[in-house]
From Swiss-Prot:
Name this protein carries in UniProt: Probable tRNA pseudouridine synthase D
UniProt-listed HAMAP family: TruD
Principal EC category: isomerase
Similarity remark: Belongs to the pseudouridine synthase TruD family.
E.C. number: 5.4.99.27
Annotated GO MF terms: RNA binding; tRNA pseudouridine(13) synthase activity
The species this protein was found in: Pyrobaculum neutrophilum (strain DSM 2338 / JCM 9278 / NBRC 100436 / V24Sta)
């Protein structure tokens, strides 16, 4: 276990599990370098080339969707608008990477025959079903990833060998927070603290070097209070910023302007705050010992149930995703976790004291990430294929190989 660089530490990922030197390299040089195929719990792979699903009569339609370089949440919003539905009438088993080619099931309430044309989105099949797709029906995802421009091949091989022995931390990965603008968790924490001014400051006054010049200019205008000019300057794809600014132009206060952002996006901010807290707690748990060896006070998952660890019980260590109603560990594990929460100025109750639709309940997430069927070939480029359980981030595995100091420059 070695200390991670400042960017990772800012996201709560304080450590690497492996102590190998950085391999370097670039992922996602093009979307086809990062393929994601959903795996259902019955083992069915929703493959890019197509999938066979047994239809069942009911009030839902399952759609096989392949998207290239398209944001999952924005796809759902666009699909709902095109079909004249509410966004809650469309469900997914999980959010997939944007800068990638991904294949998954999307379900729509009712019988759907005609689907809209959406750039970079293919609909490869649809089936009547008796229930919506849901996270509980998803085992995970199969990844096929190309790492180009590997600078130190021997370091890449050493890292992959080390991953077979190390207990890999199940961090929430870079894309949960952003690499060009790593602020999703900061926006979420501002919401949880009811800090409208802080939310505005993060949204418009924190400007990062890899943003486009158009975005930088628009943020500067907004930060100076020139809302109308900023609204005109932001490109149309900046949904959140434009929604907030439209309200400010009409004379709204900062909090109600923030509430104009689509609910699904506000929820992503809250979940990013939860993810950041989880990463910090997981890092603190790594300081107490290997993640594959429970210690006194740990919460563990045994046969699908979360309980407190007792000697000889076994089970997988889990760490709370902090929110309303979550149980905390005991003993020295609890002491370490309470210290983190105090430093962050957040209590589990804060997640319940939110407007309806933004309340977030706690859950539990396994402390270690276990890749299945890991295979690779190393020629001019490194090609990896592996399966991760639902919620696992491929970039968490890849960061152990590449060990980037500036993730964006490596394609993360």
């Amino acid at each position: 276990m070695i200390e991670a660089p400042p960017f990772d530490r800012s996201l709560g990922m304080l450590y690497y599990a492996t102590d190998t030197y950085p391999s370097g390299g670039v992922i996602k040089a093009k979307p086809e370098d990062f393929l994601v195929e959903e795996v259902l719990y019955d083992g069915t792979v929703v493959a890019l080339e197509g999938v066979s699903i047994e239809p069942r009569v009911g009030g839902w339609t399952w759609i096989h969707v392949v998207k290239r370089n398209v944001d999952t949440v924005k796809l759902v919003l666009r699909l709902a608008k095109a079909l004249g539905l509410r966004s809650r009438d469309i469900s997914i088993g999980g959010i997939k990477d944007t800068r990638a080619v991904t294949s998954q099931i999307v379900s729509v309430r009712g019988n759907v025959a005609d689907l809209p044309k959406i750039p970079n989105v293919q609909f490869l099949g649809l089936w009547p079903m008796d229930k919506p797709i849901a996270p509980s029906l998803i085992y995970g995802n199969r990844f096929t990833i190309v790492l180009r421009n590997v600078e130190r091949r021997e370091c890449a091989e050493a890292a992959l060998a080390a991953l077979g022995k190390a207990a890999l931390p199940n961090y929430y990965g870079y894309q949960r927070f952003g690499t060009i603008r790593p602020v999703s968790h900061l926006l979420g924490k501002a919401l949880l603290r009811k800090d409208a001014e802080g939310f505005f400051h993060v949204m418009f006054c924190k400007i990062f070097p890899y943003e486009s010049e158009a975005a930088k200019k628009a943020r500067e205008l907004a930060c100076r209070g020139e809302y109308q000019k900023a609204l005109e300057a932001f490109p149309r794809g900046f949904v959140e910023e434009r929604a907030l600014l439209r309200r400010l132009v009409r004379g709204s206060d900062l909090w109600n302007a923030a509430m104009a952002i689509p609910l699904q996006i506000l929820r992503i901010y809250i979940e990013a705050a939860q993810s950041h807290l989880f990463n910090l707690l997981l890092s603190k748990r790594m300081e107490l010992g290997p993640l594959d060896r429970p210690v006194e006070g740990d919460l563990v998952e045994v046969n699908g149930q979360v309980t407190y660890y007792v000697e000889d019980l076994g089970g997988e260590v889990v760490v709370p995703v902090v929110g309303a109603g979550v149980r905390m560990p005991r003993g020295r594990v609890l002491e370490a976790f309470v210290k983190v929460l105090k430093e962050e100025g957040l209590e589990p109750s804060a997640f319940l004291q939110m407007p309806r639709g933004l309340r977030a309940y706690g859950s539990y997430r396994r402390a270690r990430l276990q890749a299945r069927d890991l295979a690779y070939s190393l020629g001019d480029d490194l090609v990896l294929r592996f399966v991760l359980p639902r919620g696992g981030y491929a970039t968490v595995l890849l960061r152990e190989v590449v060990k980037p100091t500036e993730p964006y420059r490596h394609g993360f």
